[in-house]
Regions:
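N-terminal targeting signals for export/organelle localization
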Residues: 1-51, 208-209
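Short loop/turn microsegments at loop-to-beta-strand junctions
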Residues: 49-50, 72, 170-172
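Structural micro-motif
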Residues: 135, 146, 153-159, 167-174
């Protein structure tokens, strides 16, 4: 004789199914609220990035001319970095998927350009699965890159000649608008860096060109 499941048993199973769905929905709602709130805040301006031109991982000239009229995000790294560079590059890599349908560019400047040749940077880019045409890795004269970091982006940098002999640089990612104005700094070592950076980037994208 078949037994009909009790109402309490069915209700318990339904509850077990609904709890994770409701929890997931709540988490997604909270994330959307957080991003929306961040997008409402004013995005400050911290000065203009000077004109520059270096060589990218493909051996091609790349600089201000290629970025004119575009929103872009910059960082300073080097491929043999034993410290924060892998995390910084990982954060930059995280930006690729949410920005894939935009024209926002990613630019990584090497602070060890003598070792980071275009070939070395190309290999590094491949390991990060950097999207061609979106994420460029730049090398060039050390003095010019350091001047751009210090005077242009207002970020400290040193070749380490007075310490352990390894380059020392900022862990911040920098948001630049279509007019070459610096609009935000985001420490890649902070868990919420990507969320805040994406919110501000989307805010700038919504502004008239």
């Amino acid at each position: 004789m078949n037994q009909t499941p009790s109402r309490s048993g069915v209700a318990w199973k339904v509850t077990l199914i609904l709890i994770p769905l409701v929890t997931l929905g709540l988490l997604l709602w909270l994330r959307n609220v957080e991003v929306a709130a961040l997008r409402q805040r004013t995005v400050s301006s911290y000065g203009t990035v000077p004109s520059f031109q270096f060589i990218n991982q493909n051996g091609q000239p790349f600089g201000s001319a290629q970025l004119a009229g575009k929103i872009w995000i910059a960082d300073f790294i080097y491929t043999t970095c034993p410290g924060p560079c892998p995390m910084i590059s990982s954060r930059m890599s995280e930006l690729q998927k949410p920005l894939e349908k935009t024209d926002v560019q990613l630019v990584s400047f090497s602070v060890d350009p003598e070792k980071d040749t275009p070939e070395v940077l190309r290999s590094y880019a491949e390991r990060l699965q950097a999207e061609p045409g979106r994420w460029d890795f730049l090398t060039g004269p050390k003095s010019a890159i350091y001047k751009l970091s210090h005077d242009g982006f207002k970020l400290a940098v040193s070749d380490g000649s007075d310490a352990q002999g390894i380059p020392v640089h900022s862990t911040r990612m920098v948001l630049v608008d279509r007019h070459g104005q610096i609009r935000g700094y985001y420490d890649a070592t902070e868990p919420e860096a990507v969320t805040k950076l994406l919110a501000d980037t989307n805010h700038l994208r919504e502004q008239p060109k």
